[in-house]
Structures are given as C-alpha cells and as structure tokens.
Amino acid sequence: MKTTITTNGVDLAARSRHWHDAIGRAYFPLDLSFRRPEAFDGELTMWQLGQVSLSRLTSDALMYRRLPKHFREPGPEEFLVTLPAKAELRFAQGGKEVRANPGAFFIERSHEPYEFSHSE
C-alpha cells in the first residue's frame, strides 16, 4: 500500500505542525526544528510491504531529534536505513557523528536518542 503526505495545500501557518504530526505517525515521536517554519515544504511517500516499510522523504532544511522523553511509551525496536539521494545528511547517535552524501547510507536505531539533519 502506498501513502503520500505533503504540505501542498496546507496553510503556511499550519505546515510545521502538519509535518510534525505526519512524521510522528509515519515513524515515531520526534522533535523537529525547522529552518523556515513559515515557508516549509515537504513530501513523504511510504510503501508498506508486510513487516517492512519503505519511505521517500523530501523536504526543506530540517533537524529531527529523538530524545529520552520520546521513550516514555514503549514501542517496537526499529532500524531505519537512510540513503541520501540529493544532499548531505548529518546523523549523530551513541557518541558518533556521520555526514553522508548521496551514494552512502547509515543505520538509525529507534530505541536510542539521535539527531538527524539536512540543510537542503
């Protein structure tokens, strides 16, 4: 099954809240910091393939944070494999930091705090 969530058609003042809610439903609770919340654009397409899901996320500059407060309600332990397609991504978890360019990949662990950002 394919699902697409977009900010197109969402009032500018409501876009950052809309994106925050969409990301939480698609993945798990995260804090989001927008470079330009008043003019944010994003699109998330997801495919559910049994126990595995794929997603393609494109958006304006943004930082995602998975913090200890997000672990209050237990959930399944998940791993996300991230492959940048257009720009460098920055990811920090467990005292390590990675900057990945298109062609590289990294693994995110949902059950530990992390920080993920991109500037484009």
What are the roles of these predicted feature ranges?
Residues 2-120:
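N-terminal functional module of multi-domain proteins
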